[in-house]
Amino acid sequence: MIVRIFNIVALFLAGAFYALALPHDLKNGDLVFRDGDEVISEIIKQVDKSGFSHVGMLWISDYGVQVIHSTPSEHSNIKDGVTVDSLEFFISRAKPNSVRFYQVKGSEEARNIAVQTALERVGEKFSIYPGQGVYCTELVAAAWLRAGVSISTGSRKLDMPFISDNPLIFPENLINSENIFPYPQ
């Protein structure tokens, strides 16, 4: 019975993934946005008008398309923080029809630096508080900035009780950058 349920769930997830048409020319360092299923996603969407709550950086590796991102724990055996997941797993945590790919205007050298910078942070804690870890948009913005490409239009405070009163980078701060543009759907 458990095997049957697992197979049904696996088929559903595989179907959901392959229903999404992947851009044929994805590159290292490109960004993938989603509206996630985490509690923090709902909080972010209260103030961000992009329709997204989470972002990761693509890494085209020997193992396929991977996503480097910082997130509250999505795996039962891995702590919150910067991790590398398969694109399939990243998409499986998205709400239906909420995944979009964006290309960053950057040279191949800049792309490699951005990816390497993000990879160097794998294992770092997830946090929206300065000096205590890194959150998703901060991770990708800092990696690209180290590569010489600014992809953030700024930051702002969340203005919610019990949440950091420090300015945060939101998904719309990235999407509105002149150095980021969407792949055609």
For every predicted segment, state its role.
Residues 3-11:
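Sec-dependent signal peptide recognition
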Residues 28-32:
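Loop/turn positions that initiate beta-strands
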Residues 34-100, 124-134:
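Glycine-rich catalytic cores of cysteine/serine-nucleophile enzymes that process amide/ester linkages
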Residues 110-118, 136-139, 143:
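Stable alpha-helical elements in mature extracytoplasmic
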Residues 127-185:
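Activation targets extended, charge/polar-rich intrinsically disordered C-terminal tails
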